[in-house]
């Protein structure tokens, strides 16, 4: 009886091979993969260091320093939104220090060619300014930026950028209004994730 069940089990197992057939169509994959360095949902942190140049102070301020940290998230392959916090200083001819802390939000458009990326930013925000123990907050800030970065790996890119700041000061007495214009040149590191 045991032999009968063993032979029946072997016979039924091998009989399935009689009904097996080959797939003549072969393997076909419908998806096409195209490499793009950035896609919707990708993010990056950036850190920059550089110099800031006063443009319309007629020799009253010297070249200063600037550092910033920012976060951006891609909405598509080319468009991202995010914000940036900067800190800069300039020294006057009277050895007084102008300190500015702008916090901006905006959008970035970034075309690329191979591993080279060319971000262009437009941002607006508020700044805290300190000058001769006077603190001015909030001050309106607009910033336009452009740069060129090289993607070393999928996670790291390095490059250079320039920022143009317009920081107006408006008072009740309009004769005292002033438009502060600054340009910066920076080197930067970006971490993509």
Give, region by region, the residue ranges found by the protein language model:
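Short glycine/proline- and aromatic-enriched beta-strand/turn motifs that initiate or cap beta-hairpins
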Residues: 20-75, 188-193
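Sec-dependent N-terminal signal peptides
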Residues: 4-14
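Solenoidal tandem-repeat scaffolds enriched in leucines and small polar residues
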Residues: 184-186
């Amino acid at each position: 009886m045991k032999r009968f069940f063993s032979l029946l089990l072997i016979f039924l197992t091998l009989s399935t091979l009689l009904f097996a057939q080959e797939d003549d169509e072969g393997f076909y994959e419908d998806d096409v993969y195209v490499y793009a360095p950035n896609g919707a949902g990708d993010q990056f942190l950036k850190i920059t260091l550089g110099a800031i140049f006063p443009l319309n102070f007629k020799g009253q301020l010297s070249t200063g320093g600037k550092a910033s940290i920012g976060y951006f998230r891609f909405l598509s392959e080319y468009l991202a939104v995010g914000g940036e916090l900067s800190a800069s200083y300039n020294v006057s001819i009277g050895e007084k220090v102008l300190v500015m802390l702008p916090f901006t939000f905006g959008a970035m458009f970034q075309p690329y060619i191979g591993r080279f990326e060319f971000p262009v930013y437009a941002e607006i925000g508020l700044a805290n300014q300190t000058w001769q123990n006077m603190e001015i907050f909030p001050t309106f800030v607009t910033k336009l930026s452009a740069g060129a970065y090289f993607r070393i790996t999928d996670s790291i890119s390095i490059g250079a950028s320039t920022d143009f700041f317009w920081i107006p000061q408006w008072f009740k007495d309009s004769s005292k209004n002033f438009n502060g214009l600054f340009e910066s040149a920076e080197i930067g590191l970006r971490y993509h994730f």
